[in-house]
């Protein structure tokens, strides 16, 4: 049987769901291939969305017209804004979600998306045909040129499934998560699988690799799941959420589900003693697992080996939902034998009678070298083939969702031969993520942090719609309703900012308040904007002194708190924002200098050997991208500039 589509998405995880809905909403006839329709967007590890830098990515997905933020708002059972003690550049929203409801909300989104079909099956073979070779870029006679490996001599035409169905399309997006040749480990026991009790996808990696696309192995893991009825909560510390819930979606609803607390406790020396006794059977330390795991989410056994003098490690017990007794023990990822895990847990006072639903386990899986991709996430080797999510060497639902959105957009554009959509380092964390992947590559699972972004003050969680919604609307991904919401918010912010810039405050109106909060009093009239710039002053306390300010802050019909927050940040940090924007614009000049196809790097002796090798392999699109490749020095960039100017 042959089924014809514009776009085929392989895998129904977070990358696949965002990719499928993005492509379909742009008008492409799309088919999402998944092994289990009842595990759409499964939270395979912790039941939470957002976190440091990750929350910004969710806001960006939403601003582009994606779905993760909307689904999170409908299923959140606890909210926290992380990094509140620091500046707004690094504030990051995070929500615990009801795992089961999260799946069904996503399933509802897919079922109600026009142009989108779901096919329950397993991909086995990538279908590829020869394509006309790309025409080499014209080069100056003074600059050596070479035909690069990035020229696509083949094009994807579809996939074949294990049941013999042939799905044909102009674009195929691979979002297979940890399922490609997945191998799970608990102690010395090894079982093929992509997730606990779910089969691995065999042979599909090889069908891709035979076309010249290289791959390697990575490892990840997940903790034990605990029965809440067996926990002694009196021996734990409660960790409630925050009341001022900030919706992830700019169009999201207010809290729907009842809010649940998390709980904290610590491991004990007795716990550590039992875990150490089982290290000989740990697949991480007996040679069973050779691949690299995530640096920033180590297993409990790795913590013991790395920090042997620590007497305790913090653990966080997180609810999985409102109607289940299953709880997630954050901080206790492990692949130790089952009996070791259970005995170690029972040496923690709060878990002395613990019962578990399933033990922690590790999983090894295939990923593809992301330097083989362009910034659209399309393969440099096979036209129309896109990759997104953990198959690119990343870790995290949010990183996957961001890549899926970009891949879905570009897969749809590829079908019509239209322009490509590229996100940049100064317009989004997604842009930082993709640029890091395709420029630097990965040798361990990649996780996003605010420290990876050089333009953090521009990439705040409060202004993702300002950065991206108009672009998404022009693409046809963001709806008119979403765009109108942004225009309304934009107008409300402008009204507040203009009021503060134009309204004068006299000393007699405000000096008593200023003295009470410990800041300098006024000797003459000043604008409200000048007062807001002071660290002790914010809209909340100042509006209590100035009724006219309170009135304009409350004038917005929707999302008053977030609108006021965005306006306050604009006023407080105006100088920093402008300075960073000027620097970003300077870097854009290098982004506009295209070098792809203009050099035979192997013949440029003035470049270092490492630089020549890296440039030959990665084939950067622009001079700016070349400057970010590890091993390419500023002097190497100057050599290329001299050659370009000849």
What role is predicted for each listed range?
Residues 2-15:
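Beta1/beta-strand and adjacent pyrophosphate-binding region of the FAD-binding site
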Residues 3-5, 162-171:
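Core beta-strand elements of the Rossmann-like FAD/NAD(P) dinucleotide-binding domain
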Residues 10, 166-177:
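Short hydrophobic core segments
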Residues 21-125, 163, 175-195, 199, ...:
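Conserved N-terminal/central alpha/beta ligand/cofactor-binding core
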Residues 38, 206-342, 439-512, 516-524, ...:
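An anion/pyrophosphate-binding glycine-rich loop and adjacent beta-alpha core
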Residues 127-132, 144-165:
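Conserved beta-strand-loop-beta-strand element in the redox core of flavoprotein oxidoreductases
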Residues 328-394, 422-435, 560-614, 619:
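A glycine-rich dinucleotide-binding beta-alpha-beta segment and adjacent secondary-structure elements
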Residues 452, 469-638, 642-645:
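Extended, charge-enriched "interface" segments that sit outside catalytic cores
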